[in-house]
From Swiss-Prot:
Chain spans, region Disordered: 310-338
GO biological process, one term: cell division
Main localisation: cytoplasm
Protein name as annotated: Leucine-rich repeat and coiled-coil domain-containing protein 1
GO cellular component entries: centriole; cytoplasm
Subcellular location: Cytoplasm, Cytoskeleton, Microtubule organizing center, Centrosome, Centriole
Coiled-coil parts of chain: 428-641
SUPFAM superfamilies listed in its UniProt record: L domain-like
Species name: Mus musculus (Mouse)
Length: 1026
């Protein structure tokens, strides 16, 4: 056996110029033991005892190097391999990454299952010069995020990084949030730990390297078993010719090999076709390999012809009795001779088919099928040429036989030779029939493979559609959540605006009450003035009638002054009580501050974040469950493959069972077609579901539009009521202006009457007393004026504070409007339905802004009213000053008026009559104004009650609509979850069916291979006996 292995190594060294070399599990201790050619493109040294990378400096064109499962502790000796694309150093003893500076074209690097804790060797690979895209570092000892990011930041083309796989990772993977940190600092990454940026698992199916397997069956038929170029069962390489017969072990020794060795060979062959060896650059190389294979086939045919001519013994060159050259037996013999090409082993081929089933891609399958179709006619031409050459050779042999028959005279052995020839003819006919059945079976297997690929395509399309539906559902939910947040914000703003409206109305009512109190005070002052005037008239009448009654009149005046003092004190007390009440009301009022607003916002945000986190956790749990199910399926598939490999040698059936298995496979095909129909119906149901969801969403949008229209209608009614209130306020102001004018006219007339009456006063003493009383009253009035000024200042301060508060609120509202505008700009990129909603929201915002402007105008009007009241107070002060001056003038003119008294007595009676008439008219107007004022107040109260009722009804409607929307959303979510569960069940059923089909095809293939082996063994034994 050792000699066989050595010969295989030498033969592989000799044939390394073809491009690929495989020395898997050969027990090599160093690469220097091999003689490698500089034109090699790929080397596979998996599962050896190599401890150092050396003796590959001269291989300039090397592109794929596999040194996995060795004892390498240091990366070195790769400085000259500038064309290297893939490097596999997994399952070694490496502790540090280094020596990769010269690998400019390196795209894939596998360093898994090592002892690496230092990645500083990746620093020289930074920049646009290097093309490293894939790094596998799982099952190592990397424990620093900073070091990892520092070494990988400059890898501009890095798209796939694996730090954890199948539960085996690095210490860095235990750090919380390491995935988010790596994705933020490495934006070029697309896949991290076999998951994309969104955390979804990615199936890492890569291109398989078995482009040349379609020619293996043809090589088995072309190379015969008795040629000196057979290949042993332990051979794995496909492109290497077999050693001579004297070097190979016997068939009995091969039969005696245990099952464990076969399993080991299978397991060792499976990783030889790892996906890391394949790139799209190998397509051209594979075509070159096909051409080389064609040349080798021609050489093999010529060698087999020469070997047949050389190996024909002289004893066999005897004529047949009653045989013809054109008979069926000779024709079958010639066909058999033309097909004598070195036989290939089936164990590695089976292993490669398993690997291709696991890692087969659609594009690759199409490419292989195209190659198969393009290469078949060329190989048929080769087959025809070889058959013609062999026929010519056989004719030469027959001529030699006839020449030898004349010389040879030994007829005793003719009967034995004839029997042997007949047996050979029968065996060749059986072989020809078996080959025809084998061709049919191979065609049928190709059809089954095509159907399986089509089913895989349908399955992948179903998965893609489900993923798209999930993405669409997630986007719709996200949009709904954003719209609900906007609606909540607008509702909060509406509530705030209503609260501000109520506050402004309360302030307006307070100002109106204050004005009423001032009017009442003025009325009381006027009454007092009327009483004073009546007392003065009485005094004048008493002076005219009786001069002696002056003392009594003085006493009466004193009593009246005492009453006035008491009234003034009462007024002071009332004013003080009202001031206290006003202050208490101001203190008890609750203003909506910025801190409270921010607290409410933070609470709402916390609630929404919690909801979002809960939803994310639920989706993550679902993803984990699906990943576990997928891993379980993979494990089951692997277990099934191992079981099938163990049963590989136990199956020994004949050609009769093939027909029954074909019938079963036909039934399975019919069953698969039914399943395909079911999957198509499933896809149709999913499309119907999507359409129903779209209709439901349109209905929801319509309901939202109706709600917005109702809001606009209510806002319009409120604006109409506010305009009516404005008109009434304007009418009240006009009436007040008329009232002030009438009061000014009455004051002028009363001053005239007061001057005329004072002329009657003759007595100086009485005037002195009156002056003293007037001075006292003047002091009291000045005190009252000072108190009124203080009140005015306090009102001004309160007004300023109210204006500041209003300005702050206006600024807050402006900031809110700016944020809303920004939200509008971000939402303009969405669908048409969302645009309609945004337009409605903009209309609502405009209405709110108009309301705010109206409120600001109302506040301005209130401020103007306060300014008017202040002006009125100033006018009253000026009038008081003018009256004081008039008093002084009256005192001076008193002496002159006494003389003119008798002449003006008649005028006084006429004036008194006119004054009475004016007073009656004024009182009538005042009554009418009061009645109108009461009516307006009642109307305002009714309007406020109606507004409150409308607000309550609108809120109820909004709550009912929101509850109905939430119930519909929950129903839709439940229905979607049910449909998704049904789809997953159907997908699982389809996968189980595909597994069954794969198992059946593998069993059929194994049966055929066993039968072909039995035929080959039988033919080889017959040849040995001959």
């Amino acid at each position: 056996m050792e000699a066989a292995v050595c010969s295989e190594i030498e033969r592989e060294d000799g044939d390394s110029s073809c491009g690929d070399v495989c020395f898997m599990d050969k027990g090599l201790h160093s690469i220097s033991e091999l003689s490698l050619d500089s034109s090699i493109h790929a080397i596979n040294l998996h599962c050896n005892n190599i401890s150092k990378i050396s003796s590959i400096d001269h291989i300039w064109n090397l592109r794929h190097l596999d040194l996995s499962s060795n004892q390498i502790s240091q990366i070195e000796g790769l400085n000259t391999l500038t064309k290297l694309c893939t490097l596999n150093l997994s399952c070694n003893l490496i502790t540090r990454v280094e020596g990769l500076e010269a690998l400019v074209n390196l795209t894939k690097l596998n360093l898994s299952y090592n002892h690496i804790n230092d990645l500083s060797g990746l620093m020289p690979l930074h920049g646009l010069k290097y093309k490293l895209r894939y790094i596998d570092l799982h099952s190592n000892y990397i424990d620093s995020i900073h070091h990892l990011l520092q070494c990988t930041v400059g890898l501009h083309f890095l798209t796939n990084l694996i730090l954890e796989k199948d539960g085996e990772g690095n210490p860095i993977c235990l750090i919380p949030g390491y995935r988010a940190i790596i994705l933020q600092t490495l934006p070029q990454l697309r896949i991290l730990d076999c998951k994309n940026i969104f955390g979804e698992p990615v199936s890492l199916e890569e291109i398989n390297s078995s482009h040349l397997q379609c020619l293996e069956g043809l090589l088995d038929n072309l190379v015969s078993s008795d040629s000196p170029l057979n290949i042993s069962e332990d051979e794995v390489n496909d492109d290497v010719p077999a050693p001579p017969m004297d070097v190979l072990p016997s068939l009995k020794e091969f039969k005696s090999t245990p099952e464990d060795n076969v399993l080991a060979s299978l397991l060792s062959v499976c990783p030889s076709s790892e996906p890391e060896k394949i790139n799209q650059e190998n397509d051209f190389q594979n075509e070159v390999k096909l051409q080389k294979l064609d040349d080798q086939i021609l050489q093999l045919l010529n060698e087999t012809n020469n070997s047949l001519i050389d190996n024909v013994p002289e004893k066999d060159l005897r004529p047949k009795r009653d045989t013809d050259i054109t008979s069926e037996s000779d024709y079958g013999n010639r066909r058999e001779c033309s097909r004598k090409v070195p036989r290939r082993t089936k164990i590695p081929y089976y292993a490669r088919t398993i690997q291709t089933i696991k890692h087969h891609n659609k594009n690759n399958g199409a490419f292989v099928s195209c190659n198969r179709k393009m290469r078949q006619p060329y190989l048929r031409d080769l087959y025809v040429r070889s058959s013609l050459v062999n026929c010519n050779n056989l004719r030469d042999l027959d001529e030699q036989k006839t020449g030898v028959i004349k010389v040879d005279k030994n007829f005793s052995d003719n009967s034995t030779y004839r029997s042997l020839v007949e047996q050979l003819d029968q065996e060749r006919e059986m072989r020809w029939k078996a080959e025809q059945t084998e061709k049919k079976l191979m065609d049928y297997i190709d059809e089954l493979h095509k159907q399986a690929d089509e089913k895989k395509d349908v399955h992948s399309q179903a998965l893609i559609t489900t993923d798209r539906l999930k993405d669409a559902i997630f986007k719709e939910r996200h949009c709904k959540a954003q719209l609900e947040i906007i609606v909540h914000r607008l509702q909060n703003e509406v509530k705030k605006l209503t609260i501000e409206l109520m506050k402004a109305r309360d302030q307006q009512e307070d100002h109106i009450r204050h004005l009423r109190t001032l009017e009442r005070a003025l009325e009381k002052m006027e009454k007092q003035k009327a009483q004073q005037q009546a007392a003065q008239i009485r005094l004048i009448q008493e002076v005219e009638l009786k001069a002696s009654a002056a003392d009594r009149e003085i006493n009466l005046l004193r009593t009246s002054l005492h009453q006035e003092k008491q009234q003034v004190q009462q007024l002071h007390e009332l004013l003080a009580l009202k001031e206290q009440e006003h202050r208490q009301e101001i203190e008890t009022r609750q203003f909506f501050t910025d801190a409270e607003f921010q607290d409410a916002l933070t609470k709402r945000l916390c609630k929404e974040e919690r909801k979002h986190e809960q939803e994310v956790k639920e989706y993550q749990e679902k993803i984990d469950i699906l990943n576990q199910q997928y891993l379980d399926l993979e494990n089951e598939f692997r277990i099934a493959l191992t079981v099938e490999a163990r049963r590989f040698k136990d199956v020994q059936d004949g050609f009769e069972d093939v027909a029954t298995e074909l019938a079963k496979s036909k039934h399975a095909l019919i069953w698969a077609q039914r399943k395909e129909n079911e999957s198509s119906s499933l896809i149709k149901d999913l499309t119907c579901m999507v359409k129903e969801q779209k209709t439901k969403l349109s209905e929801v949008c319509k309901l939202k539009q109706e709600a917005a229209a109702n809001l606009q209608n209510q806002i319009n009614t409120l604006e109409i009521l506010i305009e009516d209130d404005k008109q009434k306020s304007i009418q009240i102001e006009l009436l007040k202006h008329e009232k002030t004018q009438l009061i000014s006219e009455l004051a002028a007339k009363e001053s005239l009457i007061y001057g005329l009456r004072t002329e009657r006063k003759v007595w100086g003493q009485e005037l002195a007393c009156q002056s003293s009383t007037l001075s006292q009253s003047r002091g009291k009035l000045e005190a009252q004026i000072e108190s009124l000024c203080r009140e005015n200042e306090s009102l001004r301060k309160s007004h300023e504070s109210d204006c500041d508060a209003l300005r702050i609120k206006c600024k807050i509202i402006e900031d809110q409007n700016e944020t809303i505008r920004k939200l509008k700009d971000s939402l303009q990129e969405k669908d048409g339905q969302i645009k309609l909603l945004q337009e409605q929201i903009a209309l609502i915002e405009k209405c709110s802004q108009e309301q705010l402007n109206e409120k600001s105008s109302q506040l301005d009007s209130i401020v103007e009213k306060l300014e008017r009241h202040n002006e009125r107070k100033e006018k009253l002060k000026q009038q008081l000053k003018a009256k004081e001056l008039e008093l002084e003038e009256i005192r001076k003119a008193y002496s002159t008026l006494n003389k003119k008294w008798h002449d003006k007595g008649e005028l006084l009676s006429h004036l008194e009559m006119q004054v009475k008439e004016v007073k009656e008219k004024f009182e009538d107007k005042e009554r009418k104004l009061k009645a109108e004022r009461d009516k307006s107040l009642e109307l305002q109260k009714d309007a406020m009650e109606k507004l409150q009722n409308m607000d309550d009804a609108f809120r109820r409607q909004v709550d009912e609509i929101v509850e109905a929307h939430q119930a519909e959303i929950m129903q839709l979510a439940n229905e979607k979850q049910k449909y998704i569960d049904c789809a997953n069940l159907k997908v699982q059923q389809v996968e189980d069916e595909m597994r069954g089909l794969l198992d059946e095809t593998c069993k059929n293939k194994k049966m055929m291979e066993e039968k072909i082996k039995q035929l080959a063994c039988a033919i080889s034994e017959i040849q040995k006996e001959m």
